[in-house]
A protein has these predicted regions:
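Glycine-rich loops and low-complexity Gly/Arg-rich segments
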Residues: 54, 77-81, 100-105
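Acidic-leaning, charged glycine-interspersed low-complexity segments
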Residues: 6, 19-24, 50, 95-149
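Short histidine-centered catalytic/ligand-binding loop motif
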Residues: 86-98
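Short, cysteine-centered beta-strand-loop-beta hairpins and adjacent loop/turn segments enriched
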Residues: 61-65, 82-88
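Generic alpha-helical propensity signal that fires on short helical segments
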Residues: 45, 69-71, 95-97
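Small/polar-rich, solvent-exposed N-terminal microdomains that initiate assembly or binding
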Residues: 1-67, 118-121
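Oligomerization/assembly interface segments of phage tail-like spikes and tubes
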Residues: 69-84, 141-150
Length: 150
């Protein structure tokens, strides 16, 4: 039996490094343990202002389908960009950048899944429905972006 557990941290770190838009806008990949524990950002905030944050914890669901039980994992990724304080035009520009990167990531994940890239780890990901939510205007001081779950 082969282990096809999806390594979300390694995968999204690779996407961040290979994505031209991320490189051009100096996005840094880091980890967190949910929105309340952003230790990766705190460790790197002096050197970077744009982040791809991958949660190092997963939500899971065990369910029965026929005769066996299966586990389904939910992975969360944040795309965050800092904007100039009290500058709503800059905030909108940075939010649009995060949206654009999100669409690029989705395209790449679909491509990788069907080409069996990343050692086939994306094989069992359900990419037909990906939930995303944008940060509200006052969610994090001076930072905008979105998170998505798959």
């Amino acid at each position: 039996m082969t282990d096809k557990t999806f390594d979300s941290i390694a995968y999204f770190t690779k996407l961040c490094e290979e994505n031209k838009t991320c490189r051009d806008n100096k996005f840094v990949a880091t980890t967190c343990s949910g929105p309340d524990t952003v230790q990766g950002v705190l460790q790197k905030f002096r050197k970077a202002s744009n982040f791809i944050m991958v949660s190092d914890t997963v939500d899971s669901n065990t369910h029965s389908a026929g005769e066996g039980f299966f586990e389904r994992y939910g992975y969360t990724v944040w795309i965050l960009a800092a904007y100039k304080r009290d500058d709503m035009e800059d905030r909108e520009k940075k939010l649009n950048l995060c949206r654009y990167i999100f669409r690029q990531f989705i395209s790449r994940m679909l491509r990788d899944k069907y080409r069996e890239a990343f050692e086939g780890q994306l094989e069992f990901l359900k990419l037909t429905q990906i939930y995303s939510s944008e940060l509200g205007r006052w969610s994090m001081n001076g930072v905008t972006g979105l998170y998505f779950m798959m």
